[in-house]
């Protein structure tokens, strides 16, 4: 169906999030993903310091890259499947095995990071707004996202699925971010 407010294509019937993400189901990570995380972390490290929130980092790929940065005090990772991967908290990496909720944030972050999360959000305008409200002026939000319409045009028809529930486009991303 097409959304009447933002005009994007989206799935009509959504699986409740607590059922969809009850168990981890993306267990393999290939070379492309590992390179993506390393490159994204290298980019982020040019700007970041202080306290960081990462949303959706179950395997801690980004957090492990970022923890090497001496300018970062802490990285709090929110994901519902952190512990099933055997992750352990460290002095710098804190684990919150839950869906991100602005009310559960203990201290103002200097940066919020989410890689390939935005396409999973059921109410992205509202959730991005809540994330941005946690940030002070001069803070950062780092996002990496697939562009679903371009993937589908390139023949990747699996880009829209039970987890990627709406057609992320560059224009829609711009509109979402400007609404914050």
Regions flagged by a language model, labelled:
Residues 1-111, 115, 125-128:
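Conserved N-terminal segment of class I S-adenosyl-L-methionine
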Residues 116-120:
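A short His-aromatic
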Residues 125-142:
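A short glycine-rich, Lys/Arg-flanked "PGG" loop and its adjoining helix->strand segment in the class I
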Residues 141-166, 170-174:
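Short, glycine-/aromatic-enriched active-site segment of Class I SAM-dependent methyltransferases
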Residues 174-180:
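Substrate-binding/catalytic lobe of Class I Rossmann-like enzymes that use SAM or dcSAM, i.e.
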């Amino acid at each position: 169906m097409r959304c009447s407010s933002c005009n994007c294509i989206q799935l009509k019937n959504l699986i409740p999030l607590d059922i969809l993400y009850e168990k981890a189901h993306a267990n393999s990570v290939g070379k492309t993903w590992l390179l993506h995380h390393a490159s994204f972390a290298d980019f982020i490290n040019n700007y970041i310091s202080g306290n960081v929130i990462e949303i959706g980092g179950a395997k801690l790929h980004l957090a492990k890259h970022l923890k090497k940065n001496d300018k970062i005090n802490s990285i709090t990772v929110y994901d519902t499947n952190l512990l099933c991967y055997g992750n352990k908290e460290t002095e710098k990496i804190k684990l919150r095995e839950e869906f991100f909720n602005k009310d559960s944030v203990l201290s103002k972050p200097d940066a919020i990071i989410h890689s390939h999360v935005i396409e999973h959000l059921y109410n992205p305008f509202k959730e991005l707004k809540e994330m941005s409200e946690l940030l002070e002026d001069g803070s950062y939000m780092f996002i990496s996202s697939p562009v679903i319409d371009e993937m589908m045009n390139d023949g990747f028809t699996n880009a829209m699925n039970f987890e990627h529930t709406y057609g992320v486009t560059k224009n829609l991303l711009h509109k979402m971010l400007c609404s914050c």
